Swiss-Prot record:
Interacts with CBX5 (HP1 alpha), HDAC5, MBD1 and SP1. InterPro entries: BAH_dom, BAH_domain-containing, BAH_sf. It comes from Mus musculus. Residues 616-771 form the BAH domain. This is Bromo adjacent homology domain-containing 1 protein. The gene is Bahd1. Residues 536-548 have a biased composition (Polar residues). One of its GO terms (biological process) is negative regulation of DNA-templated transcription.
Length: 772
């Protein structure tokens, strides 16, 4: 209050009429009332000024402070948690003033406003009332009945203040407040509830929503039907609706198991009369129909662990972990739908098409599937959205169907004349919906199907689809080619095993990896292809060979005609020479462990020390040039021979080798980050492979940096016409000198001499500085 207002107060109170009315009007807006002021107090302007000075801006009251302060405190406690009846209010101590009667003046009722309870407190109270009421036992009910003999409580029950009924409240009852559920509430709280019922109604609705959410999880805590009948309660379900998963914005009931036998009851004569038609609308009749079950009934064992799979492009649902008192569900799983396009397949056995499931499928060679999920679209009984063999068993493939497997079926658009029969190999589990007239899914069926042969139903699926807990664990289950774990993805040609750049330049397409479809013998026998294919073609698609022996070797490996067994046909030695392009083994053969492709460990093979053709001898540990394409201009590959052996199946001479990588074969092209490579520089690697000796073009030499420098100096000396050195200044040592067959002859073409200074890690695509 401003200073001007204070100065005007004496002037207003000094008038002849109504001396105290303005002051009392102002005081009534901020104090409890003015009738408590003592009548003998002088009403002078000084007294009014002092009274304004002590107004409760500083929380100070008038002379009768103690009674008024205690009275306000007791009023608050009485409105929040006061006595249960009027008789208890009379039993208060005599030294304390009595609370104001409910028949006080309208002025006091308008002034005294009780403190509103917080919504959190109301929520907790309403929720506790609903939950604690469900946990009441017969002994607790008896205790409350015996406690009802109190005269005060009997009078309160007669007036309808609260009720001891254990019947669970409906939504309409909850809307009026939780007064009928909580005996702790005061009977005089009805007036306050009539004045402001919104918080309690909101709390009751919140409690009802919490009860809905916890209804399925708290099923073990629900009293049995026998106890309900003993307590005189109704056995009809009290929850009018059940939360349901939505498919494309439409409600669909969840499939549940029966309370007694584990299976829901079917329509009339489901198995006895298969020709009877499915009713167009689920019945809402009295409970005397033995074959139908209301969808709102709470069953004892719901299909909680495995919710139905929402088909039609919807993601799968994860089952919740087990809770105390429930049957432990299957491990936490997650099903994923495949992303590859669905092939056109024959229709699956559908309800209403008895010819499709006239009998069990045969063929025990495949593992039986547990069940399948069926989705009926809006175009009739056809597989919508997902057609390729929708056999989705829960967990791993097993011949025993899981108990919680289910089928989500939505034949809402099925005409009434289409019969919905029970397949002969499955037991029905289904439930019907309430709102069949709405545009939603009206029927949910659970058809556990045990198929022993997928091809019988699907007409031969081109894809394997074993869906497990982790979905598609690897691409190998979809029959996609993958390199084996023991053999890394090498830059070799996919069909021939020769190296190609793992990451080619930008203008060159990325080559394909070696596929398991190609046979190892064909890979080993064929000639290497070009490492840099022409523009517009992929190296992985090249199948042409550089020599004619490849076609002959492929024809030789084909299975012989049944009229001429292979053992009776003679095998001339000249044919082996053609197969090996003229290379023949030299020396005696011996058994030796050599590297063989697709073998985890070195295999014992009949080995040789050298091969010979037209007087040229190539030994083990020599370096050779291998053909890379049909054209002579194709750059050959460089490899070092580690073993020469004979293939026991075809008798062909094979060689195990280690690849040398050219600069254009490296990852990133011909410009590695370490240094600028020389013209004839190659990079050693630990990339092992096998190939036929028929791909050998000629012998070459790979030298160290010092040896290559000496070779270049000698070549320059010979080019200048200087005489070569005839005698050595230092006699060579037999232990440390290069063997004569590995020394570079003086008349060797410089194009056949290579320099190797570094090792290339083909797995990581980098050059090793310090190879170990």
């Amino acid at each position: 209050m401003t200073h001007t207002r204070r100065k005007s107060l004496p002037m207003l109170s000094s008038g002849p009429t109504g001396r105290g009315e303005p002051l009392q009007m102002e005081d009534s807006n901020m104090e409890q009332g003015t009738e408590d002021v003592e009548p003998g107090m002088p009403e002078s302007p000084g007294h009014l000024t002092g009274r304004r000075k002590n107004y409760p801006l500083r929380k100070r009251s008038l002379v009768p402070e103690k009674p008024k302060a205690c009275k306000v405190l007791l009023t608050r406690l009485e409105n929040v948690a006061g006595p249960r009846s009027a008789d208890e209010a009379d039993e208060l101590p005599p030294d304390l003033p009595k609370p104001p009667s409910p028949t006080s003046s309208s002025e006091d009722a308008g002034l005294v406003q009780p403190r509103k309870r917080r919504l959190a407190s109301l929520n907790a109270e309403a929720l506790n009332n609903l939950l604690l009421e469900r946990e009441e036992t017969s002994s607790l009910a008896g205790a409350r009945r015996s406690r009802g003999g109190d005269p005060h409580r009997s009078r309160d029950r007669a007036t309808g203040s609260w009720s001891f009924s254990k019947k669970r409240p409906r939504l309409g009852d909850l809307g009026e407040g939780s007064r009928d559920l909580s005996p702790e509430l005061a009977p005089d709280e009805g007036a306050r509830r009539d004045g402001d019922p919104a918080p309690k109604r909101l709390a009751s609705l919140n409690a009802a929503a919490f009860l809905k959410l916890s209804q399925e999880r708290e099923l073990p805590l629900r009293p049995s039907r026998a106890q309900a009948e003993a307590d005189g309660r109704s056995t009809e379900p009290l929850a009018p609706r059940i939360l349901r998963p939505k498919v494309n914005g439409k409600n669909c009931p969840k499939a549940r198991q029966g309370a007694g036998s584990g299976e829901a009851t079917g329509p009339p004569n489901w198995q006895e009369q298969p020709d009877e038609r499915w009713p167009s609308a689920p019945p809402h009749g009295p409970p005397t129909q033995p074959s139908h079950q209301a969808p709102g009934k709470a069953l004892e064992n719901p299909l909680r662990p495995n919710l139905p799979l929402l088909m039609g492009g919807q993601a799968a649902l994860k089952p919740e972990p087990g809770r105390p008192g429930e049957e432990s569900p299957a491990p936490k799983q997650e099903l994923h739908q495949p992303s590859f396009p669905a092939p056109q397949l024959s229709p699956l056995p559908m309800p209403g098409n008895p010819a499709d499931y006239s009998g069990p499928c045969g063929g025990p060679e495949l593992t039986a599937l547990g069940s399948f999920y069926l989705y009926c679209g809006q175009d009739g009984l056809q597989c919508g959205a997902y057609s390729p063999c929708p056999m989705l068993p829960e967990g791993k493939l097993s011949p025993v169907a899981a108990p919680n497997e289910g089928l989500l079926m939505a034949p809402s658009s099925v005409p009434s004349g289409v019969p919905f029969q029970h397949p002969p190999w499955s037991a029905p589990r289904y439930c019907s919906s309430e709102d069949t007239g709405a545009n939603g899914y009206s029927i949910c069926g659970v058809l556990p199907l045990s198929l022993t042969h997928i091809g019988t139903t699907c007409g031969g699926c081109p894809y394997k689809m074993p869906f497990t807990a982790e979905g598609c664990r690897s691409l190998g289950q979809l029959e996609f080619p993958l390199p084996e774990a023991g053999h890394p993805a090498s830059p070799a040609h996919p069909l021939l095993g020769c190296p190609v750049p793992s990451v080619p330049p930008a203008a060159e397409p990325i080559p394909h990896l070696q596929t398991p479809i190609s046979e190892p013998q064909t890979v080993a026998r064929a000639c290497p292809q070009s490492a840099k294919p022409p523009s517009g073609s992929k190296s992985g698609l090249r199948t042409g060979s550089s020599c004619r022996h490849t076609v002959r070797s492929k024809a030789a490996r084909r299975p012989s005609h049944p009229k001429q067994p292979r053992a009776q046909r003679p095998r001339p030695r000249r044919r082996r020479r053609r197969r090996t392009n003229g290379w023949v083994p030299v020396g005696a053969a011996c058994e030796k462990a050599v590297y063989v492709l697709d073998e985890p460990e070195p295999a014992i093979r009949k080995s040789y020390q050298a091969v010979e053709r037209h007087g040229e001898t190539i030994r083990v540990r020599d370096t050779v040039l291998l053909k890379s394409g049909p054209r002579k201009t194709s750059t050959p590959y460089v490899a070092k021979i580690s073993a020469l052996w004979e293939n026991p199946e075809s008798g062909e001479l094979m060689m195990s080798l280690l690849w040398y990588y050219r600069p254009e074969h490296l990852q990133g092209g011909r410009s590695p980050s370490m240094h600028e490579p020389l013209q004839n520089e190659v990079f050693a690697s630990r990339h092992q492979d096998q190939n036929s000796v028929a791909c050998i073009e000629e012998k070459c030499y790979v030298l160290t940096f010092a040896e290559y420098c000496r070779f270049c100096a000698m070549a320059k000396r010979r080019g200048e016409g200087l005489p070569s050195r005839k005698t050595a200044l230092v006699p060579p040592s037999a232990d440390y000198s290069t063997p004569p067959h590995r020394t570079v002859p003086e008349d060797t073409d410089p194009e056949l001499v290579f320099l190797c200074r570094h090792v290339y890690d083909f797995r990581h695509g980098r050059i090793l500085k310090n190879p170990q």
